[in-house]
């Protein structure tokens, strides 16, 4: 396997409905799609990964935690540079007004075009109810996002993304991976492939 898969995951704060608008816009601007900051910086500008994205995943139930996630599919020999680039982005959010405006427009159009019909009305109601939201919140999200500025997004990033401690998962050919580069991220725990992909019975973890 020439390509290595890397997943960065951090447990965030407990779900807060007041952050839904900011997290929705943030995901479009920062981590999702070909025009996002993460993809443009890591894939297009620096050619450090085949694919890359990041997202702030909100909980699906009130009282549960949100999660910060980032992913890269990169060549094993590019792991050191790719990790440095990703961690820099997850610590210091680049601010590009043109991309921010485009992300806001795309997010607003997506909300405006969303149609919930038939049985989906019930399931949407149930999903919102689990979050402690008693009514359709799309209009409120739209109005909030419409008024948001880069400063609002920066404040959201600094409070919810910057400074998080990540668990990093790597899948790849062991002989091609730079373990010294990974050691800079923390303690390494190697998992046996038979443990990960054992479909017959679960054995004890081989270290």
Task: Tell where the protein language model's regions lie, with residue ranges.
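PPIase-associated folding chaperone regions across multiple families
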Residues: 18-25, 30, 177, 186-189
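A common structural junction motif
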Residues: 89-95, 183-194
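Mature hydrolase/peptidase catalytic cores and their serpin-fold inhibitory cores, especially
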Residues: 151-158
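Amphipathic, charged alpha-helical segments and their helix-to-coil junctions
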Residues: 170-172, 179-186
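M16 family metallopeptidases and their MPP-like homologs
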Residues: 2-14, 23, 27, 39-151, ...
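Hydrophobic side chains in well-ordered alpha-helices
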Residues: 38, 82, 156, 178-181
């Amino acid at each position: 396997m020439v390509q290595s898969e890397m997943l960065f995951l951090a447990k965030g704060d407990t779900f807060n409905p007041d952050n839904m608008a900011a997290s929705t816009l943030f995901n479009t601007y920062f981590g999702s799609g070909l025009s996002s900051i993460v993809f443009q910086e890591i894939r297009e500008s620096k050619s450090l990964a085949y694919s890359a994205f990041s997202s702030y995943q909100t909980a699906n139930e009130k009282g549960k935690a949100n999660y910060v996630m980032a992913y890269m599919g990169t060549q094993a020999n590019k792991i050191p540079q790719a990790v440095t680039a990703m961690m820099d982005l997850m610590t210091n959010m680049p601010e590009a007004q043109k991309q921010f405006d485009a992300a806001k427009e795309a997010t607003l159009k997506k909300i405006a075009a969303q149609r919930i019909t038939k049985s989906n009305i019930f399931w949407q109601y149930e999903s919102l109810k689990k979050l402690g939201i008693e009514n359709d919140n799309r209009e409120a999200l739209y109005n909030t996002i419409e008024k948001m500025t880069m400063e609002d997004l920066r404040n959201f990033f600094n409070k919810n993304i910057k400074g998080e401690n990540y668990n990093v998962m790597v899948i790849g050919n062991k002989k091609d991976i730079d373990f010294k580069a990974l050691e800079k991220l923390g303690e390494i725990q190697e998992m046996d492939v038979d443990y990960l992909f054992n479909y017959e019975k679960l054995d004890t973890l081989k270290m």
